[in-house]
């Protein structure tokens, strides 16, 4: 099976080391453009753009990088509760049209009550997923061309519709990650690609089996992806030395503060990530070549594959054998590590590299009448 490998745009900061400003670098548009263009040229299938108050806005970043890339796809966040599903569908269709079919969407419910409150979201874990399910039902149907009337507990729309269709039909793919029971139910019911963070293969196998069973019970199939960091070097020893250097400026106080901040989340996935290392740096290789050092201070994806090209490729194949089709990778700093992955890892993988999309046909229709409908064609005999 050919694998699709994505990279990551570090809109929340970048540098050579974790937990310190030593080796940090400014992340401006020029730098993000360098990373995006490197990923585009090296053969990455797309880039994940993170979301949250610590990040630049994912939609604006993606839109700004469309003109300077050719084949790269952009995976950006949908935020139920922060935006209406109808408006999100309009934005999704526009991004898909502007990118000529290179837009992908990642449903993010959030897990930090403090940050969510700042965005005006005061729902508990279960209610957020109920809202996300309602949001997604409307979002999908509107993007697929329906005029939607829907009244749920959290979402109420009447006559919701699009006037400009997306390029990808029936709509751009929807991605989603979540480890709780309600999250997996949502994935089984509505999403196209289920994402997991980089847990050991045995745990990933269990997750995939649960989501597959839930999807099958609904008459659906779901594809699977995984989010990992990667530290690849010419030799295994060099890779492990690089892993040690990444946290070499990290002190115990910073680790403790980071773990305390992450502990306030109600995200089951984040709790599972934290359990892999327990906030301690003495046993970070939690599975062969799977290192949990990143998660000492980073929320979300907290594990890295470490080794030379053949070793990392073999570990990726273990995940692929479980059903993983897409790998979303990253490394510090993201520009240099994109090239290392391209030069040291890609030769050992069978890659699914997207082609440059052909321009989509856009039908001329004139200005919409009264902001409500497209003007009619003039009959042939009346011209």
From Swiss-Prot:
Record's protein name:
Alkanesulfonate monooxygenase
Organism phylogeny:
Bacteria, Pseudomonadati, Pseudomonadota, Gammaproteobacteria, Enterobacterales
* SUPFAM superfamilies the record matches: Bacterial luciferase-like (SSF51679)
Instruction: Describe the task this protein carries out.
Output: Catalyzes the desulfonation of aliphatic sulfonates.
Q: Which reaction does it catalyse?
A: an alkanesulfonate + FMNH2 + O2 = an aldehyde + FMN + sulfite + H2O + 2 H(+)
Q: What class of enzyme is it?
A: oxidoreductase
One of the record's GO molecular function terms: alkanesulfonate monooxygenase activity
* General remark: FMNH(2) which is absolutely required for this enzymatic reaction, is provided by SsuE.
The keyword Oxidoreductase is assigned to this record: yes
The protein's gene is named ssuD
């Amino acid at each position: 099976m050919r694998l699709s490998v994505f990279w990551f745009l570090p809109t929340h900061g970048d540098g050579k080391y974790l937990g310190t400003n030593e080796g940090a670098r400014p992340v401006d548009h020029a730098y993000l453009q360098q990373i995006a263009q490197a990923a585009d040229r090296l053969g990455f299938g797309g880039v994940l753009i993170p979301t949250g108050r610590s990040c630049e806005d994912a939609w604006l970043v993606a839109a700004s990088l469309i003109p300077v890339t050719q084949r790269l796809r952009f995976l950006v966040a949908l935020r139920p509760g922060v935006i209406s599903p109808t408006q999100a569908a309009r934005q999704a269709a526009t991004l898909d049209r502007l990118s000529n079919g290179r837009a992908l969407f990642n449903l993010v419910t959030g897990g930090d009550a403090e940050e969510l409150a700042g965005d005006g979201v005061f729902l508990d874990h279960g209610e957020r997923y109920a809202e996300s399910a309602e949001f997604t039902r409307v979002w999908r149907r509107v993007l697929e061309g329906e005029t939607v009337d829907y009244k749920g507990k959290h979402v109420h729309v009447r006559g919701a519709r699009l006037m400009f269709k997306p390029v990808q039909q029936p709509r751009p793919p929807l991605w989603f990650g979540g480890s709780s029971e309600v999250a997996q139910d949502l994935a089984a019911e509505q999403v196209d690609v289920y994402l997991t963070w980089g847990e050991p293969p045995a745990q990933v196998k269990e997750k995939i089996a649960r989501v597959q069973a839930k999807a099958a019970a609904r008459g659906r199939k779901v594809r699977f992806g995984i989010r990992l960091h990667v530290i690849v070097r010419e030799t295994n020893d060099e890779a492990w030395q690089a892993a040690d250097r990444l946290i070499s400026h990290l002190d115990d106080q910073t680790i403790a503060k980071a773990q305390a901040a992450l502990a306030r989340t109600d995200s089951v996935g984040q709790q599972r990530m934290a359990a892999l290392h327990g906030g301690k740096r003495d046993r970070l290789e939690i599975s062969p070549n799977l290192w949990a050092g990143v998660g000492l201070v980073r929320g979300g994806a907290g594990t890295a594959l470490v080794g030379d090209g053949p070793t990392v490729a073999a570990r990726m194949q273990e995940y692929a054998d479980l059903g993983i089709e897409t790998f979303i990778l990253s490394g510090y700093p993201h520009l240099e590590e994109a090239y290392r992955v391209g030069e040291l890892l890609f030769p050992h993988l069978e890659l699914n590299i997207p082609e440059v999309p052909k321009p989509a046909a856009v039908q001329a229709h004139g200005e919409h009448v009264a902001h409500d409908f497209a003007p009619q064609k003039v009959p042939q005999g009346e011209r």
